């Protein structure tokens, strides 16, 4: 403690002392003083700041106590998405992952990986500007999270100010908030003493504590933060490796898990995995596996991402926990697509940190395969957040009165017929929108964050709206009045007004999200986006023939049929028309993709027709390619086919034209192909020239600094629409660097390499030239 009589110097000295002790305790795992001494100095600082309020600083340790409760959390758009990871469940899958890495990098050398325990907590993003913590956010759906800055400031292992003078201008840190076992036990003891509900496991306790609207509650909870990556770095030289990045985070005062190691090759990874697995029960926090990441950042950039996960990382999951219990009964749930799912009602049992009383049985085939009966003693499996499932029965313990399990003959909800094709695993209710459960689940899906993202419209409110018969379809949501909503239980005028405002805000939505929200069978986010990108507008998708749908990336035969069947159903068409009439406006380019139109050749149409059942058996793709290039139109092909054998182009075997003539005459295939051809011609007339639609093809762009009019993720998507590859670091292959406010080391490197640099205004001008609004992405 300082003896200086200047209060400001005293306060600064006390803050420095406490921050240094916190760094020694949390980062170096080397406590410098007993807790009692820390508490004495903390009280001295608190007393001094109370005497001189002007001396309180944002990074003072006394400011971790929490603030007045919030009404709700603000939404935060992640500039760099917080992605999930692919999983490996055994050694073979890990070897396969390593093989994919080396093949994609085209290297034969052994790869260095960073191996780290996979903490079972809540993923969090911390944003520092000029060393000060300015924002903390939850992962959310990876694109949008919640602003938890006030709560994060109460966590002792979260630095309010980065350590040292040489800190980045802008740093986004990713990590995990966990609750240690000892703290969890103490918290539950307090809950029990107060007559409150106990937490099932440390993960639930951590998540519930971090998402408290009253940060004073968060401050009272024993939470800890471990940093594991950085998403943004400006004003500081980017480290060359992941391990060097972790060293930098430690130097700046962030806590990094002490178990993390650099491993040379897969065998070293497996040794690390086994070591952590053996150490697992002795750790003071929950882990559910190990994460492996390619150490070199340049290799990470080269490997890139697939869908919602990086190619350069994988989670090696631990074996799941299993327990025995008794199957008391089976209920059948109906999902939004009508699928019937059997749910096991179990004698409650403690599995993997939670009490399990329900578990999935998957489907009737699985029940029969496992010969599971009501009354059986069964094995229940649970891994992390995976829904518990019954994996087998113990016939030797089967009671004499055990009952078999049969598929219901009619829907347990609406009484409609249950249909199941001879080759179908899933049985479905045919009730459609008259089935209350299907209607209910379809509306919940429509409102969900990854779909229309209607803030405040949660599952319980949807249940209430359906139960009160205020809505029967998703279009009815946009006909709701505030007074109708305000009359519901636990809803008031303010909540009702907020919901109506959220519904209004959701009307402008990307076409891909809109298609996903409709809940078309087998259509996920990626397929919905591909449909939007290929066709360019909703009307074209609604009227697209199966022959064209099959040409869309990732659309197979069953998916194409599902899309066609959905838009052919009059009830679905009425719902879509109702949404449009209420002002819902799906946003897209308005024109088909030039690359997609170019792919719709006569040969492609013939291949699609073959998959749909046109009798082209024995005619291979090579022959179809020759026919498609030799004849310009379906009419020309039909005329040649009518000539029969001998009219085949070179490279096509004799007899094909005779077979083709017969096939074209069956089931109106000639007319169907000609209709598709006309659609293609119309799309070609509306599509931009290919070079105009992909003006940045083959170029690598880099984004740096803060963009003001849209996020970096939106800018990235917009550039990708123009054909550019967006990289995370500057190299000699970079074509352009977009520099926003506070651009740092990337800008400096670009200037040193003589790479062209543009600002946000120039980027926006380029995007406007090509009709792209990044704010709508």
From Swiss-Prot:
Its cofactor is Mg(2+); Mn(2+). SMART domains: BRCT, HhH1, LIGANc. One of its GO terms (biological process) is DNA replication. Keywords: DNA damage, DNA repair, DNA replication, Ligase, Magnesium, Manganese, Metal-binding, NAD, Zinc. Residues 691-777 form the BRCT domain. InterPro entries: BRCT_dom, BRCT_dom_sf, DisA/LigA_HHH, DNA_ligase, DNA_ligase_AS, DNA_ligase_CS, DNAligase_adenylation, DNAligase_N. Disulfide bonds: none annotated. PROSITE patterns: BRCT, DNA_LIGASE_N1, DNA_LIGASE_N2. The active site is at residue 118. Its EC number is 6.5.1.2. NAD(+) binds at residues 35-39, 84-85, 116, 139, 176, 293, 317. Zn(2+) binds at residues 411, 414, 429, 435. The keyword DNA damage applies. Pfam families: BRCT (PF00533), DNA_ligase_aden (PF01653), DNA_ligase_OB (PF03120), DNA_ligase_ZBD (PF03119), HHH_2 (PF12826), HHH_5 (PF14520), Nlig-Ia (PF22745). GO terms for cellular component: cytosol. It is an enzyme of class 6 (ligase). It catalyses: NAD(+) + (deoxyribonucleotide)n-3'-hydroxyl + 5'-phospho-(deoxyribonucleotide)m = (deoxyribonucleotide)n+m + AMP + beta-nicotinamide D-nucleotide. PANTHER family: CHROMOSOME TRANSMISSION FIDELITY FACTOR 18 (PTHR23389), DNA LIGASE (PTHR23389:SF9). Belongs to the NAD-dependent DNA ligase family. LigA subfamily. HAMAP family: DNA_ligase_A (MF_01588). DNA ligase that catalyzes the formation of phosphodiester linkages between 5'-phosphoryl and 3'-hydroxyl groups in double-stranded DNA using NAD as a coenzyme and as the energy source for the reaction. It is essential for DNA replication and repair of damaged DNA. This is DNA ligase. The gene is ligA.
């Amino acid at each position: 403690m300082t003896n200086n009589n200047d209060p400001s110097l005293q306060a600064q000295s006390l803050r420095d002392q406490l921050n240094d002790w916190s760094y020694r305790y949390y980062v170096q795992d080397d406590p410098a003083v007993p807790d009692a001494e820390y508490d004495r100095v903390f009280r001295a600082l608190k007393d001094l700041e109370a005497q001189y309020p002007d001396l309180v600083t944002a990074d003072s340790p006394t400011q971790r106590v929490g603030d007045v409760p919030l009404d709700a959390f603000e939404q935060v758009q992640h500039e760099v998405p917080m992605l999930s990871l692919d999983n490996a469940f055994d050694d073979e899958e890990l070897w396969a992952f390593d093989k994919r890495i080396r093949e994609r990098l085209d290297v034969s050398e052994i790869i260095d990986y960073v191996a780290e325990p996979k903490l079972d907590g809540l993923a969090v993003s911390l944003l520092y500007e000029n060393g000060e913590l300015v924002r903390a956010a939850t992962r959310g759906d990876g694109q949008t999270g919640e602003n938890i800055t006030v709560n994060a400031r109460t966590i002792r292992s979260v630095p309010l100010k980065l350590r040292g003078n040489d800190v980045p201008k802008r740093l986004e840190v990713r990590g995990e908030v966990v609750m240690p076992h000892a703290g969890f036990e103490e918290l539950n003891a307090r809950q029990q003493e107060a007559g409150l509900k106990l937490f099932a496991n440390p993960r639930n306790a951590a998540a519930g504590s971090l998402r408290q609207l009253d940060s004073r509650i968060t401050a009272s909870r024993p939470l800890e933060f471990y940093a594991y990556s950085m998403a943004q770095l400006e004003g500081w030289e980017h480290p060359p490796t992941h391990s060097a990045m972790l060293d930098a985070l430690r130097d700046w005062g962030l806590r990094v898990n002490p178990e993390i190691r650099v491993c040379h090759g897969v065998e070293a990874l497996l040794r690390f995995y086994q070591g952590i697995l053996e150490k697992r029960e002795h750790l003071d926090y929950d882990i559910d596996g190990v994460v492996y990441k390619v150490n070199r950042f340049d290799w990470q950039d080269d490997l890139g991402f697939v869908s919602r996960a990086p190619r350069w990382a994988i989670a090696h999951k631990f074996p799941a926990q299993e327990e025995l219990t008794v199957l008391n009964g089976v209920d059948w749930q109906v999902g939004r697509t009508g699928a019937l799912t059997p749910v096991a009602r179990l004698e409650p049992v403690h599995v993997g940190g939670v009490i399990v009383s329900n578990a999935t049985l998957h489907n009737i085939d699985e029940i029969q395969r496992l010969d599971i009966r009501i009354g059986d003693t069964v094995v229940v499996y649970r891994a992390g957040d995976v829904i518990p499932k019954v994996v087998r029965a113990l016939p030797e313990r089967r009671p004499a009165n055990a009952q078999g399990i049969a598929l219901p003959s009619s829907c347990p909800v609406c009484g409609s017929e249950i249909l199941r094709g001879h080759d179908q695993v899933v049985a479905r209710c045919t009730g459609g929108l008259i089935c209350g459960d299907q209607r209910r689940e379809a509306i919940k899906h429509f409102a969900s964050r990854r779909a229309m993202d209607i803030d405040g419209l949660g599952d319980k409110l949807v249940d209430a709206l359906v139960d009160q018969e205020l809505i029967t379809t998703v279009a009815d949501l946009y006909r709701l009045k505030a007074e109708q909503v305000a009359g519901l239980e636990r809803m008031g005028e303010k909540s009702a007004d907020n919901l109506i405002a959220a519904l209004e805000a959701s009307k402008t939505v990307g076409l891909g999200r809109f298609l996903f929200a409709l809940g078309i069978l087998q259509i996920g986010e990626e397929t919905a986006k591909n449909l939007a990108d290929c066709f360019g507008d909703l009307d074209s998708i609604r009227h697209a023939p199966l022959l064209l749908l099959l040409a869309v990336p990732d659309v197979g035969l069953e998916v194409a049929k599902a899309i066609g069947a959905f838009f052919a159903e009059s009830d679905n068409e009425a719902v879509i028309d109702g949404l449009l009439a209420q002002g819902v406006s799906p946003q897209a380019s308005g024109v088909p993709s030039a690359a997609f139109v170019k792919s719709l050749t006569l040969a492609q149409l013939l291949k699609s027709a073959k998959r749909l059942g046109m009798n082209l058996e024995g005619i291979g793709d090579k022959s179809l390619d020759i026919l498609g290039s030799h004849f310009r139109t379906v009419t020309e092909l039909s005329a040649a086919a009518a000539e029969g054998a001998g009219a085949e182009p070179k490279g096509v075997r004799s007899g094909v034209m005779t077979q083709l003539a017969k096939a074209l005459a069956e089931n109106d295939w000639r007319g169907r192909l000609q209709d598709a051809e006309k659609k293609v011609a119309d799309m070609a007339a509306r599509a931009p020239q290919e070079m105009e639609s992909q003006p940045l093809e083959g170029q690598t762009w880099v984004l740096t600094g803060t963009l003001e009019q849209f996020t970096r993720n939106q800018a990235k998507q917009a550039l990708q629409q123009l054909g550019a590859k967006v990289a995370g670091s500057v190299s000699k292959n970079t074509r352009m660097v977009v520099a926003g406010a506070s651009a740092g080391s990337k800008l400096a490197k670009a200037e040193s390499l003589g790479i062209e640099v543009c600002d946000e205004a120039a980027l926006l001008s380029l995007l406007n030239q090509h009709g792209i609004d990044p704010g709508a992405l």
